[in-house]
Every structure is written in structure tokens, then in C-alpha cells.
Amino acid sequence: MKVFILACLVALALAREKDAFTVSSETGSISSEESVEHINEKLQKVKLMGQVQSEDVLQNKFHSGIQSEPQAIPYAQTISCSPIPQNIQPIAQPPVVPTVGPIISPELESFLKAKATVLPKHKQMPFLNSETVLRLFNSQIPSLDLANLHLPQSPAQLQAQIVQAFPQTPAVVSSQPQLSHPQSKSQYLVQQLAPLFQQGMPVQDLLQYLDLLLNPTLQFLATQQLHSTSV
């Protein structure tokens, strides 16, 4: 529509220019040249205006076509998800087997109980030095003359005197079968420590005496320390 209106305007302008051209041609040749140049300028302006209008029309058509096309929205479709039924049974899991520790024999358990009663857990084992060993053996050997300790004696003689001075329990013959090693050892420790409990021996000395009974190497070291102090 706009192009048609522009074409009509151009036609009217040309008609007017032609009328003016005919009038001016009658007036003179000089004015005719100026009118021709003026007409050419107007024609160029009209052509430029027509081009601008045509470009505007094309742009409007292009934008209207873009807006009319539906825009594609990604993931516009709804995702169907079926609900989980309530009657599904849980997956069967393997039964958990409790871990079983090492099997402890009743003889070893009785020995550990006897040791736990003699050795309290909250007390730390004292360090065995020469003075403690001397005091321990002096309290257990009343028949040993301390004045004669300066005399040189062999380790075997000194150990024999110490063993004789300790209280010995008589061997009881029974018709029962022979006990296993852990049970016989625990009974031996209880028999050795029972008289010391009755005599009111200090707990520290009892613990050191128990170490001497459990570790024969400590007995040999104790005899060596006694021999060195006597020399």
C-alpha cells in the first residue's frame, strides 16, 4: 500500500515538473537547463525514498514471519513416571553371622582369673631392683644369718638356701587324673601365695614374688644380685 502511494506521488511530481518544464521552455533556454537539473535531483530523491520504504517493508515482513513461528521449547513434553507399588518385597539379604573369637580352654580361663585376682589392673608392676629383692628375701628367710652374707658363697649354695627357706607345701596324692599344664600351674601359684596372704605380706612384695615364680630367669638374676651385694 505504501509503495502504491509513493508511486502516485512520484507520478504527480513528474506531471507537475513536466508542466513546469513546458512553461519554462517557453520562457527561455537558460531556465530550462536549471529545471532539468532540479528535476533530476528530485527523481533521485524519490528513488532513494522508494528504496528506503521497500527496505522497511521487507524488514517488517521478516520480523512478522519470525514472530508468527512457534518457538520450540526443549523438554516441553511431560515425563511420565509410574509410582512404585507398595507391595514390593524387600531384597533378601544374607544372614549376618556373628564373629566368634578364639576359644579359651577352661584351664586357661581359671588361670587368668587367678592371675587377675592377684594382679590388680590399676596398679603398675614396680621395677625389680636389688634393694627390693634383698628386702623380699630377707622377709621370707628368717633362718638366714645376714651377718654371714659377706662370706663368699657359690650361686648354687645361695639358691639352695633360698629355696629351702621358702614355705613348701606337701604333695597330696590323689586318685584323680593328672591335671593339664595351665591348671596345674595355676594351682601351684595359688598354693605358693596362700601362706603369704595369711602372714600379711605387703601387696608389692606379693607381686614381685609372683614374678619370680612365673619367670625363672628373674630367680637366677636375684641370686646373682645377692651374691654381688654379699661380695
Swiss-Prot record:
Q: Which UniProt keywords apply?
A: Milk protein, Phosphoprotein, Secreted, Signal
According to the record, the signal peptide region is: 1-15
Q: Where in the cell is it found?
A: Secreted
Q: Where Phosphothreonine occurs along the chain?
A: 27
**Quick one: a GO cellular component term?**
extracellular space
> A biological process (GO) annotation for this entry?
lactation
What tissues is it present in?
Mammary gland specific. Secreted in milk.
Record flagged with keyword Methyltransferase: no
Q: What is its main location?
A: secreted
Q: Which InterPro entries match?
A: Casein, Casein_beta, Casein_CS
Phosphoserine is found on 24, 29, 31-32
Q: Which GO terms describe its molecular function?
A: cysteine-type endopeptidase inhibitor activity
Question: Do you know which Pfam families this protein is assigned to?
Answer: Casein (PF00363)
Top-rank taxon: Eukaryota
Q: Which family does it belong to?
A: Belongs to the beta-casein family.
PANTHER family to which the protein is assigned, alphabetical? BETA CASEIN, BETA-CASEIN
What job does the chain carry out?
Important role in determination of the surface properties of the casein micelles.
What is the protein name for this chain? Answer: Beta-casein
Q: What is the lineage of its organism?
A: Eukaryota, Metazoa, Chordata, Craniata, Vertebrata
Q: Which gene encodes it?
A: Csn2
